[in-house]
Amino acid sequence: MEQDLRSIPASKLDKFIENHLPDTSFCADLREVIDALCALLKDRSFRGPVRRMRASKGVKGKGTTLKGRSDADLVVFLNNLTSFEDQLNQQGVLIKEIKKQLCEVQHERRCGVKFEVHSLRSPNSRALSFKLSAPDLLKEVKFDVLPAYDLLDHLNILKKPNQQFYANLISGRTPPGKEGKLSICFMGLRKYFLNCRPTKLKRLIRLVTHWYQLCKEKLGDPLPPQYALELLTVYAWEYGSRVTKFNTAQGFRTVLELVTKYKQLQIYWTVYYDFRHQEVSEYLHQQLKKDRPVILDPADPTRNIAGLNPKDWRRLAGEAAAWLQYPCFKYRDGSSVCSWEVPTEVGVPMKYLLCRIFWLLFWSLFHFIFGKTSSG
């Protein structure tokens, strides 16, 4: 498959993506099986009543999943989780409870589904893994089950959250060392961040995701998180194109070039949080001062999607540099595809206090000059 992609002319990349669209029939069958499993679990007696369960296939269900991927997350929202602190404090107990209930469902064999529940990796595991198979599914599916505080029960996904919400998240309600550990709570916001994008951009994300999987097969772990590459693709499009009909090869090349410049990356979005709240602003400035690469989660400012190990990026950057020489970045006449002009960093506004000082000085100077003129 790697040979197929790298040898395809730039003009044929769109056709290549079409051949790797999500397997819609498999998704539909998987959804039916998951719905049946969720219905059984909802009827059981958990330590706290299940509010609802949300299942998403592959890459968090964002419309960017590749054909042939058979992994999924099953997020369990429980009524007795009413805050981030609750999730952190009760996570281990809830994971054990979910494992117990899954084992009982498996023993009863009521939904025609077979699954193998794995042992917990550690007493503090944040997820429970199991494999599922069913007569309607052509392949086995690997699941991670995660209990979560239902954040979207308190937020409108279509509106910018009250910034006090983020101020509470970063000031005391998130224990030290737990930053970014609550990312599953933000799944809905994160999905919407990508779901609202143009169709062709989502297809470009699929292409980048496929490239990432090829690199992973060749290089193995550790590599930067796949979600970092997805966000990098969105960023490249936002700053380099912003049109719904663009040259796929140009977008692909731009993303790979950004990967090679990982030491310079400083990327964030202000879709859900911004610098207008003083406490949030101070925190964002601290986050953006950290060693690069920095790619802040659009929904959760406590989480640097780029990770903490630049060595992971160095390995991926080496592979990206090699790929830039392949035929997939050349036209039929042999000329090279040009990338979009995209900066490696997003500018950071002045701190709140400095901004106030600046305006006070400006205002004083204004009154001094014009007050003196009017009195004269």
From Swiss-Prot:
Transmembrane spans: 352-370
Effect of Q90R: In strain: DHA
Effect of R190Q: In strain: BALB/c, C57BL/6J, C3H/He
Major subcellular site: endoplasmic reticulum
Gene3D superfamilies: 2'-5'-oligoadenylate synthetase 1, domain 2, Beta Polymerase, domain 2
Disulfide bonds listed in the record: none
Result of changing F368L: In strain: MPR
One of the GO BP terms on file: defense response to virus
Record key words, sorted: Antiviral defense, Endoplasmic reticulum, Immunity, Innate immunity, Membrane, RNA-binding, Transmembrane, Transmembrane helix
Residue spans, topological domain Extracellular: 371-376
Topology class, membrane: Single-pass type IV membrane protein
Gene Ontology cellular-component annotations: endoplasmic reticulum membrane
Functional description taken from the UniProt entry: Does not have 2'-5'-OAS activity, but can bind double-stranded RNA. The full-length protein displays antiviral activity against flaviviruses such as west Nile virus (WNV) via an alternative antiviral pathway independent of RNase L. The truncated form of the protein lacks antiviral activity.
Protein name: Inactive 2'-5'-oligoadenylate synthase 1B
Higher taxonomy: Eukaryota, Metazoa, Chordata, Craniata, Vertebrata
Gene: Oas1b
